[in-house]
Amino acid sequence: MQMILFKMNQQHYLIAAETVEEVVDTVQITKVPLAPLWVKGLINLRGTVLTVISLAQLVGLPESKTNRNIMIMKKDDERRGLLIDEVIEVMDVDPDDIQLSEDQAALYFTGVVDLGEQTIADVIDVNDKIF
């Protein structure tokens, strides 16, 4: 399966390429009063208003200081932006290489993939918690 490898907070993550519509440069994010901390706010992307979320804050990690991109994810008819530092590459991952990990925040990750060279990537589950 094709997956997108990206970096956030010096950690690597994988997300199914079929769930990603595009990656754009970070634009001005309008804060939403009383929204959860992981909801960074709203953006206007070519006339469409999208919610932008912080995966780091969603799973309790420190907020990244270098969010340079917003990954636009889609599920059914909904779209959300995910703050990331950078896309590294699109790669093929054998589903059998995804190892389940009880240490992960199971609501957001399906497992981990060993990419070699001391790099382990968490596999993001685009589910109802993100959408």
Question: In which residue ranges do the predicted regions lie?
Answer:
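An acidic, low-aromatic, low-complexity terminal/linker signal
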Residues: M1-F131
